[in-house]
C-alpha cells in the first residue's frame, strides 16, 4: 500500500526546502574555519640558534592568525624543515615530504644550490616557490612557479652605479665574496666602457675570514673608494679588520651592497671619520613598520643572533623582513582564491596541483605595502623590479638617511639632517690633524725667542696665523711638521713619483699642507686644494740698476731726435713759404721813403734770410723787428707762433724731469729680454711650481727659457728662495719666483726690484689628500676670513715691514754741471761760430770796398781794421761812377729788395 503525501509534490514546498538547505550550507561554510598549510625550508648550522628567516616565517603566520584582518576565515599552519648548508639532496627530500603533507607554497631555502633543487620540484608539481634572497636568473628562465622578494640585482647594480657617479669617483675597487658577485654587479662592471671610470676587481679569501692581507694590499695601492659585495657577517668582520689596519679614516669611502648595513654595530666607527654608505629597503620611518619591528624584537630577544654575526640585538634583518612580507603576499593571493584546496602531492608521480597555476598567477598579481615598501612582481620572471631604497651613511650620530633611490627616478640625495642647521665644524670638531709645511719667509719661519720653544710654538708667519684662524673657526687641533725633504712637490718624469709636501699628502702622512703651495694642474690631479687664500703670479727678481746722470746734453732729451729734426725742417719750410708768399703779396711791399709819397720805389723786408730769422725768433720766443703786413703772411706767422707755443710748452714741461730725475737703466725689462740673451743667468726653485710652469709651458718664450734652465740645471736651479735671493745680490742672476714673495723681499732689501709684470696667474691654497672631507670645510672658512678682511690684515702684518728709506724731498733740485753743462757748450760754440762769421763778413766787406775804390784788397782790409780798432765813426764808401737806370728798366726789374711803382717815367 502506497502512502502519498500531497504536500511533498507541491512545487512551492520543494523550492522552500531547497532555499533552506542552501542557507544552512552557507551558514555552515561561513562558520567553518579553512586551514591552509605553508611549508618552510631553512638552512641551519649545528648547535646554532633558530635563524632569523625561520623566526620571521613563524612570526608572520602567527601575526596573520591573530589579527584575522587579512584572512578572517582561514587559519594558516606551517611545516618547517631544517637542512644543512648547500645540501641540495636533503633540500629535495624535505620538499617532497612537505608536498606529501599538502602545502600551498614553499618558502626557502636561501642558498642557490638548495633553492634550485627545490625550485625544479615546485615547477614539476605546480606549487609556488617563494624566495627572499637573490638568485641568478638565466635569460631563458622557465621557472614559472617562482617569485623573489629580494630586489632585482640588475636594478640594485644601477643604484650602486648612480651612487658612484654622484660621488664623482674616478677609481673604484670592487671586492666580492663569491663569483655570483660579478653577476650581481654587472651594471657597474660595464661602467668603464661607458664612463670615465677605472675599475679594479678583487676577491675576498674563500677559505678564511682573515681579510687583512687583502686590506693591506689595498692600503698600499691607495685604494680609497671600495665597494664590498658580501654578507653582513663578512662586512662586520671587514670593518673590524679595517679599523685595526688604520683604514677607517676620513680618506676612505666604503659602499656595502648588503641591505643589512643599518643592523650592524657601527658604534666603534662613528667618530673615526670613515665614509660608509649603503642601502636600506626596510621602511623604518613608517609607524606601522616600526610597531611590527618592535614586536619582532621582543621575540628575537628569545633567540638572539650569534655573537660573531656583527648584528645588534633586536634588529630585524632584511632577510627576516622579506620573509615576513613574503608570507603576507601569499596570504593576499589566498584571500583572492577562497575556493582553493590543498592536496597531497607525490614527487614520483609528477601529477601537478590543479590550483597551482591559478594560485601562482594571483601571487604575481598581488600588491602589498609591507615592511620593505611596495611589493609587485614582474609577471614574466617573478622578480621584484619596482622598489624603493633608502641611501644611508655613517655620521657621528650613527647611520642616517641621506637620500633615496628607485628604478624610475634614480638617485635623489637629500642629505637630511633631521632639521639640524648645517654646521661646517661637524667633520672637524675636536679632531687632531697633522699639518705639513715648509720654511719660507714670511709664510713660515722659526720664532725668535730667548727661551726654548717646543711644538707649534716654534713657528710664526702668515701661514701659521692662517692655520690658527682656521683652527678657531673649525674647532680642530693640529701638529705642525716640516716636510722631510724640504720641497714643495714635483713629479719625477722618470718614475712618476712625487716628492715634497705633495707626496706626504698622497701617502696620508699629513692631513693638511698649509704653506705657499701653488695650485697647479698636475698637483690637482693627485691632491685636492681649497679655494686660494692668496692670488699671485710669477715675476722676475733682479738687482736695482745703477743710476745714470742725465748728461751734459740732457736738455735735448725732452724731445726725441726725430722731433728735433722735424722742428728744424718745419722752421726751414715755414721760412721758405713765408718768403714766397711775401714776394707775391702786393700788400707786403712798402715805400722806404714815407716822406716822399711820390717815390716809385717799394721794398720788401722778407728776404730769404729775414724770413728764416723771423722763424727762428718765433721758435726761440724772442720775436724780431720784422712784422708781416699782408693777411696771407700774417696767417703763416700766426700758425707758426701756435706751433712754437705747443712745442716750447711741451719741451719746458718735460725739461725739469729730464734734468733732475736720475735715470735707472736695466739690461732687462721683461721675460722676453731674458729669453733673448744668455749673459744674465736665470732660474727658479728646483721642483717648485715656478719650475713646473716653465717645464710644462707651450709658449715659445717660456719654452726657450726652460731649455736654458734645463741645460744649466745644476747652476741656475736653487734649493730655496733664500739661496736664489742671495745669488741675485752677489752675481749677475735673475730669479724667477712668486710675486708676493718678491713684494716681501723688495720692501726689505732696497737693492732688489721686480722686473716686468706677472708671467702667469695662480693662487696659494691649502692642500689636502685626494677625496678629503676637510677641503670644503676649509674652503668655507677661508671665504669667511676673506669676507671679514682678516686675510688682508694678516698680509699687511707680515708684508708691511719697515720698507726702504724714502728719499728726502726737495723743493727744487740743484742742477750741476753734469745736468746743464751742454748749454754752456752750445753757448761757447755759438760764440766761436759768430767770430768766424764776423771774420768772414770783414773779409767780404774789405773785398767789396777794394773793388769800389779801385785799390788793393790788402790796403782796404788794413784801413777797415784800423778804423775798427780806433772805434771811430766810419765813413760810407762811395763808388766812383754812379749808375743811372731808366724807368722802363726799373719797372721790369724783379729784385729781392725793392721795385719801382708802375706809371713813373724817371727815377729821382
Curated annotation (Swiss-Prot):
Subcellular location: Cell membrane; Postsynaptic cell membrane
Membrane-crossing residue ranges in chain numbering: 562-582, 639-659, 820-840
Glycosylation sites: 67, 73, 275, 378, 412, 423, 430, 546, 751
InterPro entries reported in the protein's UniProt record: ANF_lig-bd_rcpt, Glu/Gly-bd, Iono_Glu_rcpt_met, Ionotropic_Glu_rcpt, Iontro_rcpt_C, Peripla_BP_I
Catalytic activity of the protein: Ca(2+)(in) = Ca(2+)(out); Na(+)(in) = Na(+)(out)
Residue(s) of cross-link: Glycyl lysine isopeptide (Lys-Gly) (interchain with G-Cter in SUMO1): 886
GO cellular component: axon; dendritic spine; plasma membrane; postsynaptic membrane
Primary subcellular site in the record, as a coarse category: membrane
Modification comment: Sumoylation mediates kainate receptor-mediated endocytosis and regulates synaptic transmission. Sumoylation is enhanced by PIAS3 and desumoylated by SENP1.
BP terms from Gene Ontology: detection of cold stimulus involved in thermoception
Domain of life, per lineage: Eukaryota
Binding site for L-glutamate: 516, 518, 523, 689-690, 738
Keyword Glycoprotein: yes
SUPFAM superfamilies the UniProt entry points to: Periplasmic binding protein-like I, Periplasmic binding protein-like II
Signal peptide: 1-31
Membrane topology, record value: Multi-pass membrane protein
Alphabetical list of PANTHER family matching this protein: IONOTROPIC GLUTAMATE RECEPTOR
Record text on subunit structure and interactions: Homotetramer and heterotetramer with GRIK5. Tetramers may be formed by the dimerization of dimers. Assembles into a kainate-gated homomeric channel that does not bind AMPA. Can form functional heteromeric receptors with GRIK3, GRIK4 and GRIK5. Interacts with NETO2. Interacts with DLG4. Interacts with NETO2. Interacts (via C-terminus) with KLHL17 (via kelch repeats); the interaction targets GRIK2 for degradation via ubiquitin-proteasome pathway.
Protein name per Swiss-Prot or TrEMBL: Glutamate receptor ionotropic, kainate 2
Organism: Macaca fascicularis (Crab-eating macaque)
